[in-house]
Every structure is written in structure tokens, then in C-alpha cells.
Amino acid sequence: MSFPADSVGLVTPQKFQFEEPLHLECGRVLPRFELMVETYGTLNADKSNAILICHALSGHHHAAGYHHEDDKKAGWWDSCIGPGKAIDTNKFFVVALNNIGGCSGSTGPTSPNPENDNRPYGPDFPLVTVRDWVKTQAMLSDRLGISVWYAVVGGSLGGMQALQWSVDYPDRLQKCVVIASAPKLSAQNIAFNEVARQSILSDPDFHHGRYLEKDSYPKRGLILARMVGHITYLSEEAMKQKFGRDLKSGKFMYGFDVEFQVESYLRYQGEQFSRNFDANTYLIMTKALDYFDPSREYGHSLTEAMSKTKCQFLIVSFTTDWRFAPSRSQEIVDALITNQKPVSYLDIDAEQGHDSFLFPIPLYVKTLRAFLGGEEHLKSTSLEAS
């Protein structure tokens, strides 16, 4: 198979093992852990061209390229990573990883627990936070010999990690890109996460998280959780254009099977997701979202938290994103401007809702490329607080 000219092509994941204990915010300790990583491009001699990609809730290390010749689907952010793309692998060395607690090769609930005869951790895997993830990413940086990232980039939950980087390790990144994100979750967002969790926890096949030991799987719960989440990722306009009130069979069936196209879509998305994701991981990821709040240690003042930062910022929001509305990004921007920090902000008119950050929208791609490439048309110091 021939890959597109702007693709990174075939990529091979690498597993990094860390034998030192990892002390977590929850008070527990992982005796050792592993991180699954992919890299694209070439690290230059002085290691100054490295970009870290932080993934969202259902993301992982496979951000670009293909694993096999017959792969039909590229990495989750292939639209932005590759030769000549916004994150140009001809210029940058790009690092993507699967966070701990995940289910794509890094240490998580499906991994063997060395303190329990190497049985899967399951529900015994500790709850982890965005700060824990950033700590492990810093450890990975050390392993790679990268003292300072040229940029740390992330969308949604990934954007929260990028923001945490700027607070916890202000001397270790030059640029921070926060896309379709928020400084902390609203009560509404926490509520959506709780409904998703209860869908899983109430599934009879969940078995208190020990479904692997029971040779079972809470598939129905995970499908429902994904369906709820997916509704929040799309805008009303996107759903209207994609489905409207179209019927699958063209007429009412007067029953509870799938009738509307949007129902069929949600069930399909849930089904596909349930085949590739772990239920315990889903629970962990949603709690990490709920706990995120970099202002907590600064008197709950985001302005005070952002005063510690030293990098340049690009904050991007999308007009139809109601999961993390533009006003949430503006909170970050205002806190940075109050501190006279260099920040560029763009609210992009896009119809895809929260998922817009995954699409190669021309203005979005142009802005990201310009910010990373240092083009002068981004007048970061000229912004005024809204």
C-alpha cells in the first residue's frame, strides 16, 4: 500500500519502562510503570525541536501514520501531524504517548499488578490525575534527553495536560497550545461524566470492576457511556445537517428498535468504542477530568496559577463547542493577559462542535502552523481582555 505523500507512513510504537516508584496525588504509589510511545520526525542535535502531543479521553499514542501496510485508518490526529502539515515532521520531532490508566499499552487497569500475583489491576488501579500524567510525561522527557519542549500541544483533556505543564514545569516548554479545553470542569460537565460512569457501574457484567476475572465485560454500560459522551462532542447544527429527523427505513415503525438515523449513529459509535476501550479506564479518565483544576493550590485563583507560567500560549476554541464553550477558553486567556503573559487566542467558526479540534479546518490549521513556525502575523501581545 502506498501512503499519502504528507503521511509519516509506517510507525512502530515503543514501550518505555520506569522502575522507580511513582507517587500519585491520591496518596498511592505505583511500584513501576510503562508508557507506550510513538515518535515522528527527527530530533535535532541540540534537542530543541521536540513537540509533545497530549491525548484526550479516548486517545492514545497512535496520533499519526499507520501501523500496518493494510491499515485503513491513520492515527487520531493524522490531519495535523506529518510532512508539511500544521505540526510539520520535516521540522519537528513529535512525541505522542498513552497515559497511565489507559488501555493502549501503558500501565493501566488491564496491566498485571505485581502486588497481586500479576493479575490485572482492574478496580485496584489507583485514580490518577492530570498532574500525575504530566509528571510521567516529564519523566519520559528526561528519558529522551529533552530538557525543554519546543511546544506541548493538546485538545480537550489533552489541552488540560498542556495547561498543567505550563504551571508545573514552567521552565521546560517554550510554547503551550490549549485547544477546545477548559481551566476546570463545570457542574454540567461533571454531571455528564457521572451519568456515563453510572451506565458502566450499574451494568450487571461490571462485577465491581473485576469483569476480566469473571471472563465478562460491561459492554452495555460502556456503549451507553459512549453514546452520552458522543452527544456532547457534536453540535446541534452538526447533528441537524448530518441526520436531521431522517428515518432509517423511511417510515415510523412504532417500536423501540432504531428508527431515526441519529439513533443508528449513536449505537454504532457506542458499539465500535466498546470493542476497543476498557471500562475501568473510562471511569479513570472521567475522574481525571473532574479533578482537574490547576488553580486549586493557588487559592482557586486561575490568575494566580497562570502567574507562574513562562511560555508563549495559543488558545483555540470553536464557536459550536458546547462541551467546552469559548467562554471557558476566554477564562484562560483573561488570566494570562492579567499577568501580561504572551497569548494568542482564536475562536474559530466551525460546525462540528467539540470534535472540531480533530478536523483540518483551514483557519485552525493555518493558525497552528503559524504559531509553531513563529510567523509574525500572530500578534500575541496585542490582545486585550474581553
Swiss-Prot record:
E.C. numbers: 2.3.1.46
Catalytic center residues: 156 (nucleophile), 321, 354
SUPFAM superfamilies from the UniProt entry: alpha/beta-Hydrolases
Main location: cytoplasm
Taxonomic superkingdom: Bacteria
Limits of the AB hydrolase-1 domain: 49-358
One annotated GO molecular function: homoserine O-succinyltransferase activity
Binding site residues for substrate: 226, 355
Compartment annotation: Cytoplasm
Keywords (A to Z) from UniProt: Acyltransferase, Amino-acid biosynthesis, Cytoplasm, Methionine biosynthesis, Transferase
GO biological process: homoserine metabolic process; methionine biosynthetic process
Pathway(s) of this molecule: Amino-acid biosynthesis; L-methionine biosynthesis via de novo pathway; O-succinyl-L-homoserine from L-homoserine: step 1/1
Record-marked site positions (Important for acyl-CoA specificity): 323
InterPro entries documented for this protein: AB_hydrolase_1 (IPR000073), AB_hydrolase_fold (IPR029058), HAT_MetX-like (IPR008220)
Gene Ontology cellular component list: cytoplasm
Reactions catalysed according to its record: L-homoserine + succinyl-CoA = O-succinyl-L-homoserine + CoA
Function (record text): Transfers a succinyl group from succinyl-CoA to L-homoserine, forming succinyl-L-homoserine.
Protein family: Belongs to the AB hydrolase superfamily. MetX family.
Subunit organization: Homodimer.
Name of this protein: Homoserine O-succinyltransferase
